[in-house]
Amino acid sequence: EMSASLVGSEMCIRDRYDNLHPSRIVVGRPRSGTATEADAHLFASLLQQGAAERDIPTLYPNATEAEAIKLFANTYLAVRVSYFNELDTYCELKGLDTRQIIDGVCLDPRIGAHYNNPSFGYGGYCLPKDTRQLVANFGDIPNRIISAAVTANDERKDHIARQILRKAAGGVVGVYRLTMKADSDNFRESSIRGVIERLRRAGASVVIYEPTLKAAAFDGLPVVASLAEFKRMAAVIVANRAESALDDVPEKVYTRDLYRRD
């Protein structure tokens, strides 16, 4: 007769880095069963041995609690992204210097100068999925802040699209990269794709520069292979994350990337 034990670990979103330098190890397991408890500790020890760090904080909650740790951690990050994006929206519309204000706010050590660079919204593999999942899990439980993160992310894309349309003034909108962040090839639920949807609904003419794409079109939109041609065609160049490749056309670029980092 065979028996099996099931354990699970929090998903890493930066696998190559987090496997070597984890901030914590969380191993979820069923609520009871000595074999499963032993298996959980064995699995954690394998992760500890494979890491470059030592004395890694390790938790052994039940499976539901382990999943909740992941969902609440990612939703907190989504809330923080949305907070600094709303700060930036306020400053942009009030004519204030966003960077001055963020720098001043983040000098408070309780807040810190991390995860504070404005963007077009959060996206990627985890944050959109996990925030929606957590809202669904709350059900009838009050959750103003959790739900607001999802709403704020949509409203940020609305604002960005309006600003782009105003700057383009009827000209061609060039989208520089589809990726969710710098040094990534991941398009999944990237914020720029949500902005593109809004631009298309408004009737804007949109072209894309994305060097990882080999096709001539993406989702029905032209993909321009030559960066020089892309710059020539676009009345405004939209970049969720600014790169040095655009430094020669600053007058065309619309970005909210103040620190050139994620």
Language-model features, listed with the residues they occupy:
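Alpha-helix C-terminal capping/helix-to-coil transition sites in glycosyltransferase folds
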Residues: 7-8, 22, 232-233
